[in-house]
Every structure is written in structure tokens, then in C-alpha cells.
Amino acid sequence: TALVGEDNAEAAFEKLSSMVTGDVYGEDAVKAYANGGGAYFCGFTNSLATLTFDGETSTISGTDKDGNVLFSHAYHYIGMEPVRGLYEFESDDADSGEFTYFFLAPDTSAETYHIEFRYGSDAEALSQYDVGEYAYWLASGISTDCDQTMIDNCIELFCTENLAG
């Protein structure tokens, strides 16, 4: 309530919730939001539960909720996505399916307490945010070794960025 005051707290909650609590993405979201509005789905897709980034080997790997490895590939930088300034990476493995491309926001756990990213098999479609198979989807994650302070800082930053001024 420090940012918006007690009288505006409920409206602020509704605004913030409506931005990131979408439960559809892709063509389903395009249809659902055809008359306006729209909330981003910020979860993981394709059974992904945990991501690991290894900077030493330029490898990104992912596991499902049971710890089973879904993929593990080396990636190389291919450019910058112009709409949101995401760093674009492509797998060195030609058979990477929906994990062929990773587009990573410049967020870091040290500075923003979370990361934002997209992944998929079509780089052009990943560059579009309100059309196509990845519409209204931007995954967000927090470190698996986070503590309560990091969680609180992440929430505070989200509120400040989206409610201030």
C-alpha cells in the first residue's frame, strides 16, 4: 500500500494480477483477447519445471517436475530481439524441438531477483508478442536457491515497476 495508498490497494492488486495471471497463450490467447485486454501467461511450457544455465559450456538444460531431463543443449548467441531487448540464442543441436531457441531478458537474479525468457522452435514467432503460437507468453523464473528476502525483493520490484508514477 505504500506505493498506491490504502484506498487504491485493491485496484492495484487487480491491475498487477491481471498482467501476469493468464492461463492461455498462443492462438488460444489471441482468440480470447480479440476484443481487448489480455494477461500474459508467465509459466513454463512443454512440461518444463526447472532450467539450468551453465555459462562455462554455454549449455541450457531443463527437467520436468520429477527431475527427468527434457533437454540439454549447447547454445550460441544469434542477436538481439528488438521489441523487448531479449538476447537470442540458438541450439547447436539441429533436433532441439521446442527448445531450439531461447530469448533471454537482461534480468539477473542479482539485480532483478528473477529472469524472464521465451523458448521455442520458431525464432520469428518468438519475436511476436500478440500473435502466433507464442502470443501472450513470457516465462518468468526465480532461482531454486532463493530465500525469503529474494522473493520479497522480487515482489517489491514488480510492484514498483508497474505501479510507480
Language-model segments: what does each one mean?
Residues 1-57, 95-108:
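Short, solvent-exposed loop/hinge segments that bridge or flank secondary-structure elements
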Residues 42-165:
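Calycin-type beta-barrel ligand-binding domains and close structural analogs
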